[in-house]
């Protein structure tokens, strides 16, 4: 009932960022429903409204959240809703630095509203933000939530640090010009699609037998169709072995080494957990939670669910 009352009320008052908008990702609804666990990426309380009542905490705590990504912001919002004093720290000046890039591929622009909505909702609840600030041992919170996320994975490949090797984020943020010459994308089907809008010589090298295996099937099918329409070359069972200034070498399923031209190589091998602060946090605080990709590199759905659960435990 409160949802039906608050939705039009907030819209009428122009508080659009305080409304949980569907971002058409299909990850929590269709994707999780196929596994028997219907939920929502944006709203982790979905289908659990009566199970999780967001009751006020018995004791008000000073809570430090390290990381202003989707998981950290959800932990902050949930903790603040329960009456805690919450401060979010992030060494970057941008909110959700890694997650921001997810909104750049075709058809995913609405994902950008997730961070802005969480930020606004946190501000309304009185959450304090200290952006561009690294945490200090001088701060003595009652509870710390480590939500430092993940960083791009860089495999030990010969030539991986060459000047012509760039990250998917560099491409998506427009920091690198990839409009000329053959481009090889190591992983990252959506990044290849993004590049193919202006460059028609794009090849994907994928180590697995198929690409886009982590994508919800209802998103994967149209994405595959667009990749074929753009005539992007896709090579699977390809293990990259060497990179130089004008080519990429890979081994196929038979162990044969093959070289293909590449003026630019996009490193989109995935991510690894980034968690340099857990031990320090535990040395200075008795109640510490590590959530999302700081535990294991994953997706926003997992990070947001983790953040919500952490907020409930405080």
Predicted regions and their residues:
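Local beta-strand N-terminus motif with an aromatic residue
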Residues: 122, 141-142, 262-263
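Rossmann-like dinucleotide-binding cores of NAD(P)H-dependent redox enzymes
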Residues: 88-128, 191-238
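Flavin-dependent oxidoreductase catalytic cores
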Residues: 1-66, 70, 75-81, 85-86, ...
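Repeat-solenoid scaffold signature
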Residues: 1-13, 118-132
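Short, hydrophobic/aromatic-rich segments at coil-to-beta transitions
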Residues: 244-248
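Short, hinge-like loop/turn segments at secondary-structure boundaries
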Residues: 13-17, 104-108, 163, 220-223, ...
